[in-house]
Design a protein with these regions (language model features):
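Short beta-strand to alpha-helix junction loop
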Residues: 45-50, 92-108, 143, 149-150, ...
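C-terminal helical "tail/cap" subdomain of flavin- and related membrane-associated enzymes
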Residues: 270, 309-310, 325-416
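Central beta-strand plus flanking loop segment that forms part of the substrate or channel wall
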Residues: 153-191
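N-terminal FAD cofactor-binding segment of flavoenzymes
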Residues: 34-80
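Conserved mid-domain beta->alpha element of the FAD-binding
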Residues: 7, 275-355
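Beta1/beta-strand and adjacent pyrophosphate-binding region of the FAD-binding site
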Residues: 1-13
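Glycine-rich FAD pyrophosphate-binding loop
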Residues: 8-10, 19-43
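Conserved FAD/dinucleotide-binding core of flavoprotein oxidoreductases
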Residues: 194-273
Length: 416
């Protein structure tokens, strides 16, 4: 059968799908509004970590250009800023993860695709372009949610009930933060820091322009003491922004503050700051058009997760591969095709959404017990950490209080 695939959007989902189909000899065209050479001058897009399952897919596609022990990290440090005393413990990955600035990552993959003969069309897609695109391709994959593209796919509140952001984000790349080194006894790792009632911060060693930087991804609870960082202007007064941030880090995230060289601390460059919020959303996975044509959602168009658990990019890559396999095997692009795609990808994708949404809420008694148990049991914390690769396994353990207690008790583990 004819298989001409149109992919709207050049994020990780769209590019991993395009590169996968290219390997299978299937014609795929990527449509995007940003050329590779434009990325370097744009604002920070996100702070994304790729776990080992995603790096393995990059190896399969031949696009892992960052296979360097100087770039990867190996563990998560968990810090809870409790009033009486902080709680600090570590969980390790079986294989390392890494973070690369998407202003470097995405242009590199676009170049790979084009160098191998792939077609990328650079244009802004308007609402009235959609019917012609649907007619042009045998299957239209929508992996960008801009404008009418995202609105085509209805919200499924039974899978993600939120209608407003649960966190106010202040994300930046900084110099002057110690995140470990591959050359000493404290290898690079990510810190997951919690200030109860105020929010979380994820500290990520990240390869960016000029080498390794540190991403501070602040997930601030509306109404909390950190919340005003979402609107604090850096451009209006960089020194005031820096001092306000340092003061709040000292109060709410002291474990990270103590690793800051205050003489060197600051944004790596003015564009390395992103402020805003996202509404966690799961949408209908496809929409039908006249002429027996359909469009299928991929990545953030299908499921937008808060960045708290770092699942968005890893899920988009996973879903791209599952969709690519289904396209390769398809005999028709119809409702049955979509059922096959959804069956293949939804267990992991929906587990990531549900797990992340749960972690946005105050911890239950069972979750509090798990946190304490992980602080006492390195094997348990290692398992929790490795499951960042496999959110369906994590959700199997966290989906109810009964499951959490059973996980803790499984090997005779004892927790208060």
């Amino acid at each position: 059968m004819s298989k001409s695939i149109g992919i709207l959007g050049a994020g990780i989902g769209g590019l991993h799908l395009a590169l996968y189909l290219q390997k299978q000899g299937i014609a795929a065209s990527v449509l995007t509004d940003r050329a590779p050479e434009q990325y370097a001058a744009t604002r920070l897009m996100n702070t994304v970590a790729h776990h080992s399952v995603t790096i393995a897919r990059e190896n399969e596609l031949g696009v892992n250009h960052w296979d360097d022990p100087q770039v990867v990290y190996h563990h998560h440090d968990h810090f809870f800023n409790f009033p009486d005393s902080g709680l600090l413990f570590r969980g390790a990955f079986q294989r390392p993860s890494r973070a690369v600035d998407y202003r470097i990552y995405l242009p590199a993959l676009m170049k790979d695709f084009e160098d191998r003969g792939g077609l990328i069309e650079y244009a802004s897609i308007q609402d009235d372009d959609i019917p012609a695109l649907v007619s042009r391709f045998d299957l239209l994959v929508v992996s960008t949610g801009k404008g009418a593209l995202g609105r085509m796919f209805a919200h499924r509140p039974e899978l993600s009930p939120y209608t407003r952001p649960q966190r106010l984000l202040c994300v930046g790349l900084y110099d002057g933060v110690d995140h470990g080194s591959p050359d000493d006894d404290d290898p690079r790792g990510v810190t997951l820091s919690v200030s109860p009632g105020h929010g979380e911060m994820i500290v990520i060693p990240t390869l960016s322009f000029g080498g390794m930087k540190t991403a501070l991804l602040m997930e601030n609870i509306p109404g909390g003491d950190m919340a005003d960082l979402v609107s604090l202007s850096y451009d209006a007064n960089p020194a005031a922004f820096r001092q306000t941030l340092l003061d709040k880090l000292e109060k709410h995230h002291p474990h990270t503050y103590n690793r800051i060289d205050t003489h060197r601390f600051g944004l790596a460059q003015p564009l390395d700051l992103l402020q805003g919020a996202v509404v966690p959303t799961v949408r209908q996975s496809w929409v039908a058009f006249d002429g027996d044509k359909l469009a299928i959602a991929l990545g953030d168009v299908h499921s937008v997760v808060d960045p708290l658990m770092g699942q968005g990019a890893n899920m988009a890559s996973y879903a791209a591969f599952e969709l690519g396999k289904a396209i390769t095997d398809a005999v028709a692009f119809d409702a049955r095709f979509v059922e096959d795609v959804d069956r293949a990808r939804e267990n992991r994708v929906l587990a990531a959404a549900r797990w992340t949404n749960m972690m946005l809420q105050p911890p239950s008694e069972a979750m509090g017990r798990l946190i304490f148990a992980m602080s006492q049991d390195r094997e348990l914390c290692d398992e929790f950490t490795e499951n960042f690769n496999y959110p369906e396994r994590q959700w199997d353990r966290l989906a109810s209080d009964k499951r959490i207690h059973a996980w803790i008790d499984r090997s005779g583990r004892i927790a208060a």
